[in-house]
């Protein structure tokens, strides 16, 4: 059985979050949680929350055994980008791009 969890509009770029997602793809969930707990990246905190949600979904909705679960699918898509203006010298302005991402984690016991 499979359980899914998503975090949409997560702050942070998808490119940076994919670095974390690539580290835990295909691992057992207990090993993945250990890796995420000691990762210094901001995206690791976001991915860990989504993974914990997927584990809770599998346990509550499907009645799965937590010790059997593995991460079968994890991917990070681009979300909408917010455009902001930063004033600069001599009346100029720079555009700031505040990127968001959509994090999806699927766990399975097979």
From Swiss-Prot:
Pfam families: Ribosomal_L22 (PF00237). The keyword Iron does not apply. GO terms for cellular component: cytosolic large ribosomal subunit. GO terms for biological process: translation. Keywords: Ribonucleoprotein, Ribosomal protein, RNA-binding, rRNA-binding. The keyword Translocase does not apply. GO terms for molecular function: rRNA binding; structural constituent of ribosome. Disulfide bonds: none annotated. HAMAP family: Ribosomal_uL22_B. Belongs to the universal ribosomal protein uL22 family. NCBIfam families: rplV_bact (TIGR01044). This protein binds specifically to 23S rRNA; its binding is stimulated by other ribosomal proteins, e.g. L4, L17, and L20. It is important during the early stages of 50S assembly. It makes multiple contacts with different domains of the 23S rRNA in the assembled 50S subunit and ribosome. Part of the 50S ribosomal subunit. This is Large ribosomal subunit protein uL22. It comes from Pseudoalteromonas translucida (strain TAC 125). The lineage of its organism: Bacteria, Pseudomonadati, Pseudomonadota, Gammaproteobacteria, Alteromonadales.
